[in-house]
Amino acid sequence: MNEIIRAIEAEQLRTDLPDFKIGDNVKVYVKVTEGTRERVQMFEGTVIKKQNGGLRETFTVRRVAYGCGVERTFPMHAPIIEKIEISRRGKVRRAKLYYLRDRVGKAAKVKELLTR
């Protein structure tokens, strides 16, 4: 039974998404349906957690908009995600960045990972 589930899930996994990590700044382009119209909305922020694996994998992006923290959780392999762009690589030492919720201003920034 497990092999059947894995085979079905493997067909539905997306391979066009980049490999990003916790602490990275990403732009997530999401399809939004309003009535009969469909448009693409961008949500930019820091990845504070990734959960599960396989088809059920989710990630949460946090940003501060007008002084209010906004967190949004996306299913990784959902068809509503048009594309994901990595704008900055972050250098962190934790798997979950929940401590950013309590920080304000520059203290809420993540160090940038410099690659050569």
From Swiss-Prot:
An example Gene Ontology CC term for this record: cytosolic large ribosomal subunit
An example of a Pfam family matching this protein is: Ribosomal_L19
Enumerate the UniProt keywords alphabetically.
Ribonucleoprotein, Ribosomal protein
Which biological processes are named by the entry's GO terms?
translation
| Cited PROSITE patterns | RIBOSOMAL_L19
What is a GO molecular function of this protein? Answer: structural constituent of ribosome
Give the PANTHER family listed for this entry.
LARGE RIBOSOMAL SUBUNIT PROTEIN BL19M, RIBOSOMAL PROTEIN L19
Q: Spell out the HAMAP family in the cross-references.
A: Ribosomal_bL19
As for what it does, the entry says: This protein is located at the 30S-50S ribosomal subunit interface and may play a role in the structure and function of the aminoacyl-tRNA binding site.
Alphabetical list of NCBIfam families matching this protein: rplS_bact
Concerning its family, UniProt says: Belongs to the bacterial ribosomal protein bL19 family.
Q: What is this protein called?
A: Large ribosomal subunit protein bL19
